[in-house]
């Protein structure tokens, strides 16, 4: 079988931005082969080896005021992303296409470039589908998000 991967630059976007325009954080793409079995993952710089989830609480993402939004770094269409609330399984999270909130924040508020270059950065942002969202049914409830990759590895975030 053949798999194609788009790999982010370890330096971020064009050596300047801490994040690529598709939302992939600075990092390295690790490919491992053992006895003919292949596995891979994206390792974010400055984060734990098993960190794959970036979570924004309600109100932190424009247009998603009522939602917790999750980015799954290294995602492909074989991942499962589920959640529980106060220990009760709520099933699969809703998958959404969006521009990366961190990249857009960087372009709008942190990048210190000329107007022409900033416009180029804005245009380089791409809609991606490695985002999921949930809406709590109980205010201030305890949320657990569990993402399982194609290899059966589980990654968890708690709010």
Please place each PLM-identified region on the residue numbering:
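Solvent-exposed serine/threonine-rich low-complexity stretches and specific carbohydrate-binding patches
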Residues: 89-122
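Binuclear metal-dependent phosphoesterase catalytic core
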Residues: 2-75, 79-86, 120, 124-158
